[in-house]
UniProtKB/Swiss-Prot annotation:
It is an enzyme of class 5 (isomerase). Substrate binds at D10, S11, Y42, G43, N74, T75, T184, H185. The active site is at C73 (proton donor/acceptor), C183 (proton donor/acceptor). Its EC number is 5.1.1.3. It holds the Pfam family Asp_Glu_race. Provides the (R)-glutamate required for cell wall biosynthesis. Keywords: Cell shape, Cell wall biogenesis/degradation, Isomerase, Peptidoglycan synthesis. Pathway: Cell wall biogenesis; peptidoglycan biosynthesis. This is Glutamate racemase. GO terms for molecular function: glutamate racemase activity.
Length: 264
C-alpha cells in the first residue's frame, strides 16, 4: 500500500478531464494537480519554453511527494515526456499512446482524425504512434489553437464557441470515422464537437484512456492506495486566478473543491 498522491500536470484546466475519470475509476487514490493557466496555452510556444515550463510543474509536484506523475497535457507529452520519464525514478505517464491505441481499436474504416494544439500537431506524435501500431490507418491531423482559450475563459457554452468549433472542424467533416481529442481541454467542448462531426464519428478522449494505464502501473509497481479509504483529500493548484479555475473544476468534477494559487 502506498498512500502518497498521484501528481497531475497540465497547461491549465484541461487535465481535469483526466482527473474526473481517475476519481470515477480509482476513488481511493489521492491527487495533487497543478494547472499552469497563467501561461496557457502551451501549444503556440517554442519547444524550449514548453520544456522549461513543464520541468517547473514536475519539480513542483516532486515537492508534494507524489508516487507517480501524469502528463495530463498532450503538448507537454509531445515535447517533454520522454526526457522527464528518463530522468525520474518514479513512473511518468503521458496521454498520447493510450489515445492512439484507443483510436486504432475504434476505427472501422481506417480513417482517423486528430485535433490538438499547434505544437502537438506539428510534432506528428499521434500519426507516428498510430501508424507504428497500425500502418494501414490513415491519419488526418488538424491544429485547433482557438479551443484552449475558450475553455480557459469558461466560455464552453457560448455562441462564439459553437462558431469557432464549427469553422475549425470543417476540414474533417465527412472524412473520418474516429476523432482523437488530442488535447485534454477538448473534452470540455465535447458536446459541440460531437454535434459538428455527427453521431457516427467516435470521439476518443486521450486523457480518459490514460486512466487505464495508470491503474496498470499502480499494480505493476505495487503502489496502489488504500482501497478501504473512503474520504480522500485532493489538492488543486493553479498559477492563475483560483476563482475561475475553481468554477470550471467544480462543474467538471461535480463537486466543490478548494483551489490554491501558486507562483512557480
Amino acid at each position: 500500500m502506498d498512500t502518497r498522491p498521484i501528481g497531475f500536470l497540465d497547461s491549465g484546466v484541461g487535465g481535469l478531464t483526466v482527473v474526473c475519470e481517475l476519481i470515477r475509476q480509482l476513488p481511493h487514490e489521492k491527487i495533487v494537480y497543478i494547472g499552469d493557466s497563467a501561461r496557457a496555452p502551451y501549444g503556440p510556444r517554442p519547444k524550449k519554453q514548453i520544456k522549461e515550463y513543464t520541468w517547473e510543474l514536475v519539480n513542483f509536484l516532486l515537492t508534494q511527494n507524489v508516487k507517480m506523475i501524469v502528463f495530463a497535457c498532450n503538448t507537454a507529452t509531445a515535447v517533454a515526456w520522454e526526457e522527464v520519464k528518463a530522468a525520474l525514478d518514479i513512473p511518468v505517464l503521458g496521454v498520447v499512446l493510450p489515445g492512439a491505441s484507443a483510436a486504432i481499436k475504434s476505427t472501422t474504416k481506417g480513417q482517423v482524425g486528430v485535433i490538438g494544439t499547434p505544437m502537438t500537431v506539428a510534432s506528428d506524435i499521434y500519426r507516428k504512434k498510430i501508424q507504428l501500431l497500425a500502418p494501414s490507418v490513415q491519419v488526418r491531423s488538424l491544429a485547433c489553437p482557438k479551443f484552449v482559450p475558450i475553455v480557459e475563459s469558461n466560455e464552453m457554452c457560448s455562441s462564439i464557441a459553437k462558431k469557432i468549433v464549427y469553422d475549425s472542424l470543417a476540414p474533417l467533416v465527412g472524412k473520418i470515422d474516429t476523432l482523437v481529442l488530442g488535447c485534454t481541454h477538448y473534452p470540455l467542448l465535447r458536446p459541440i464537437i460531437q454535434n459538428v462531426m455527427g453521431p457516427s464519428v467516435k470521439l476518443i478522449d486521450s486523457g480518459a484512456e490514460c486512466v487505464r494505464d495508470i491503474s496498470v502501473l499502480l499494480n505493476y509497481f505495487d503502489i496502489n492506495g488504500n482501497y478501504h479509504q473512503k474520504a480522500v483529500e485532493h489538492r488543486f493548484f493553479t498559477t492563475a486566478n483560483s476563482e475561475i479555475f475553481q468554477e470550471i473544476a467544480s462543474i467538471w468534477l461535480k463537486q466543490k473543491i478548494n483551489v490554491e494559487h501558486v507562483t512557480l
